[in-house]
Amino acid sequence: MKRQKGFTLIELLIVVAIIGIIAAIAIPNLLNAINRGRQKRTMADIRSIATAIESYSVDYNFYPRQGDGVIGDITPFVVPTYIKKMPDADGWNNGIQWYGDTLGVSYTVYSYGKGGGADTTWINGRTTDFASDIVYAEGQFYQWPEGMQIN
């Protein structure tokens, strides 16, 4: 009797199970790394915007006099003199937000984070949730991601 060449069903099932185990370990780590990269990009963009706003205030002795809205609202004040191109979206493709006053004495630049919606309150310090807002106010981060992230 001639023996047929090929893999048995058991061998194929074992290979599929091993691939499934590897995927179960690798995919969450990959998604975490992608979200971490989006956070870092968002923080860098917010820091660049804040630097442009601070440079504007050095020249004019006040921050841009513009109410709250999306960051594009202050583009005429800072582009191209203080920043070459205004980033209009964060790492999750949500609009970067601006909160200012009409007197030009304060400002806040923030991202809604992965969740895409505003937090009910901001904490002064670090967060461990990708969905938390990233907040920069008057020269420093007020709420920022740090450490092991969830969600």
Give residue spans per PLM region.
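N-terminal single-pass transmembrane signal-anchor helix
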Residues: 2-31
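Short acidic linear motifs
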Residues: 9, 17, 48-51, 55-56, ...
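Acidic active-site catalytic centers that drive phospho-/nucleotidyl reactions
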Residues: 11, 45, 90
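Aliphatic-rich helix starts adjacent to a transmembrane/signal segment
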Residues: 29-46
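Short, solvent-exposed loop/turn and secondary-structure capping segments
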Residues: 42, 59, 120-122
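Extracellular/periplasmic head regions of type IV pilus-like filament subunits
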Residues: 51-54, 58-108
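Short, surface-exposed interaction loops/tails
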Residues: 102-151
